[in-house]
Amino acid sequence: MQLAYFHVAADVPQGAEPDAAVVIDVLRATTTIAWALNNGAEAVETFADLDQLRQSAAQWPESSRLMLGERGGQRIEGFDLGNSPVAVVPEQVAGKRLFMSTTNGTRSLQRVRGVQRLFTLALPNRKAVADHLLMDPPEQLWIVGSGWEGAYSLEDSLAAGALADLLLDAAADEACVANDELTAALALWQQWKHDPEACLRQASHGQRLIGLGDHDADFRCCAELDRLSVVPVQVKPGVLCAS
């Protein structure tokens, strides 16, 4: 199992495709996806384009859908929810399809949506995703971060290192690091693994969220390691369900 990490969607090689890919957006899209599916959402359908989201959502009854939209860390006007994992509680999302677009995470999902086995990862479901991958290890696994508007993000690299640390430990001689980006992510995880929330808060995107208001609950939720057993799996392009 060859493991490679790409900081943002634009870094993903053109004309190549791995056996499996994992998309990360710690603050906050993939954390929100994990919690929404854990709390009973029927599916999360992701969009980079807002007009496409609105058109698709309009085909569903209002009673069985929610629109989640975020730009610049804030909820988009006219949408039901923003991009907060603490907002997708069971009484809001159970049984509903969530139509979601965010500043960063949904772009990375769109970039690798053609990969046969596609998952999303956050710190709360790290072990669940690792265990799922280890049941049928891919020859080549791409871990794709989301960054912030095309730039590197500390928190996504932290989670990439956290996942790789588990996979390398469990697979022993059958797994290897395929690029320097992942080597750096592993080192970052070793530095912050005892206090991931501090890393999230120090990251530039964490500082951006702090500047927007009180997001303490989001930080706690996003940093809570191995809390969930849910594995979000793409079942058709752009549509994620719980496994």
Swiss-Prot record:
One of its GO terms (molecular function) is magnesium ion binding. Gene3D superfamilies: ComB-like. InterPro entries: ComB-like, ComB-like_sf. It is an enzyme of class 3 (hydrolase). Its cofactor is Mg(2+). Keywords: Hydrolase, Magnesium. Its EC number is 3.1.3.71. It catalyses: (2R)-O-phospho-3-sulfolactate + H2O = (2R)-3-sulfolactate + phosphate. Belongs to the ComB family. HAMAP family: ComB. This is Probable 2-phosphosulfolactate phosphatase. It comes from Prochlorococcus marinus (strain MIT 9313). The gene is comB.
